[in-house]
Amino acid sequence: MTPAAALTPTTRATFLRKHLWIPLAVALPLLFLLEVTNVDRVVSGWFFDAATGRFPLRYNATFEIVTHHWAKYVVVLIAGVVIGAWLMSFFLPMLRPVRRVLFFLGLALALAPGVVSVLKSQSHRSCPYDLVEYGGNAPHISLFEAAPPGDYPGRCFPSGHASAGFCLFAFYFAGLALRRRWMAMAGLWGGFAAGMLFGLARIAQGAHFLSHNLWSGLVCWLVVLAIYVVIFRPEAGPPAAPKANRAPG
């Protein structure tokens, strides 16, 4: 298959089934179950000390410095390198063939966490450590409930910190565009692992529930997917690349 024919109507339908409909069919029922069961509280309870009424790791220096700050800086550094490479592609002939991929990566790495941040800023759901059951003063509000009257912290859903890891899903789609299976798999599993690791650290600190992190992952996936579809539209086709190590897509 030539690059220009890489997304015919048939393969486009297959692509959307694989990257949109199947992920939604798996993620939405799982997220619904988390919403109507006690799993979130059980997981957060592992890190909550009922005797002191707090999350012992909330202000832990190692967690704050390494997993809360440094981890995000690594992702910001990656985004900075990508944007720098995209700018250099206007001057270095060797980078011109991947200019569109670099543009996609820079945009996806910025917009995926950005969308999560906007959603979080508008949310009425509070962090676990602000909830009454964990020593705070805010009520637990389900996804399907309206905000109750009163001045509560809110702005804690979905997880912004986890999105710094999940945005690395962009490298999965870059691997598809370049037909580099190793890059696609590294982006898929690396992004998932980073998002879950960043998210787990914040669960341990009482800052998020498990469902907050998984919602963040789904939002990042959908944002990155949308950007990929817009930039690598069917009529243009993905950039030319050797057929070896072609990623499925």
Question: What are these language model-derived features?
Answer:
Residues 2-82, 120-128, 138:
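N-terminal transmembrane-helix/juxtamembrane module of multi-pass inner/ER membrane proteins
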Residues 6-8, 37, 83-94, 172-179, ...:
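Structural signal for the C-terminal ends of transmembrane alpha-helices
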Residues 10-20, 88-102, 177-188:
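Membrane-interface helix-loop-helix junctions at transmembrane boundaries of multi-pass membrane enzymes
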Residues 17-18, 141-249:
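Membrane-embedded catalytic cores of phosphoryl/pyrophosphoryl-handling enzymes
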Residues 29-33, 110-115, 192-203:
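Aromatic-anchored segments of alpha-helical transmembrane domains
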Residues 42, 97-181:
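Membrane-interface loops
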Residues 87, 91-95, 122-127, 131, ...:
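Membrane-interfacial segments
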